[in-house]
Amino acid sequence: MRFLSFVVLTLVLAGCATAPAGNGSSGAASSNTATPTQTQSFVAALEAKRGSALTLAERLQVQGLTGTAKVGLNNAQNNFLNKVGAQVGLNGAVISAMFPEAGKPLSENAAVAKIESSLGKKLTVADQTAVKAATALRNNSLGNLRQGLAASIGSRTGMSTDVVLALMPMLGL
């Protein structure tokens, strides 16, 4: 009976980790949360690459890890948007619209160019430096999240990190 209760509780909690972001999330965060369909497709692709189905425990671990990684991704994106917006004086909605894809690396120069285009003027050297630093931090955070997630999933499923990394775009990472 205890085991059954544990499994049911685990399934309920795993479902929470893969549910789309609800109230209280910013627009950028909610659009970058892995949907249950994305997570299911990712799990199916993992199973296909591995050549066998994941166990229930592996499936739950993968779902939890992907949910946690997406939260980290959203935090990195929101930090980037907040730092850049505060530096150049643009509100969150404008900055968020310029950089909607949290899971994709940004070119530092392209970020500066987009902001300058939106403002209609050149950024000061200090603002350019701050935007480039925020962009580099965001890109490094994204890379670390991707690498860490791939290594964690790989170690739990017996797959190489490179194989898991190749599947990350299915999650928006």
Can you annotate each of these PLM segments?
Residues 48, 52, 56-162, 166, ...:
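Surface-exposed, polar/charged faces of alpha-helical domains
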Residues 2-9:
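Sec-dependent signal peptide recognition
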Residues 7, 25, 32-34, 93, ...:
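Intrinsic disorder/low-complexity detector
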Residues 17-19:
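Bacterial signal peptide processing site
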Residues 23-53:
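Post-signal peptide N-terminal segment of mature Sec-exported envelope proteins
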Residues 13-15:
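C-terminal motif of bacterial Sec signal peptides marking the signal peptidase cleavage site
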